[in-house]
Amino acid sequence: MKRIISILLLFFLMISCQENGTNNLPLTENFKTRSVDLGTVDSLESGKTYLSVYSRIYSFTEQKTHNLTVTASIRNTSLSDTVYISKAEYYNSHGKPIQSYLDSPIYIAPLETIEIVIDEVDQKGGTGANFIFEWEKKPDTSEPLFEGVMISTYGTQGLSFTTQGIRIE
């Protein structure tokens, strides 16, 4: 009887220690449903924004690193106008393109936010990864806001920090 209780207790301990993740969710939004023809939109201003992100960071020494989940958040800060994103390109630490997230321009409605998520196990970006975003907006509309949120949780420890994009053109 003691043995059965011990086995049941061990079983319940094992299943209670599993993560409560939602691994069946898509990591990146389906941008094809947001596709737009910019030729039909009148007089737009364009810009380009650089966003640094970190899929891996150093800890203690340069030989020890921690993997991070990256969320690149793209926000339309306008109360009334749509903004358009025509390029979302992910680059690694060496400045080489890793992935392009858009096949065609997409729209972001007023006050809407979309995200690109880089999974914690995806380490192609390295310690100095970045995004280049190209965007369009109406002349009197506020610029889109680009933020990176990096997070890692392991056991009872957690690490998170943010970066903000800078306009380069």
Language-model-detected regions and their locations in the chain:
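Short, hydrophobic/aromatic beta-strand segments
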Residues: 81-88, 100, 143-147
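Terminal connector regions
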Residues: 22-30, 122-169
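C-terminal motif of bacterial Sec signal peptides marking the signal peptidase cleavage site
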Residues: 13-16
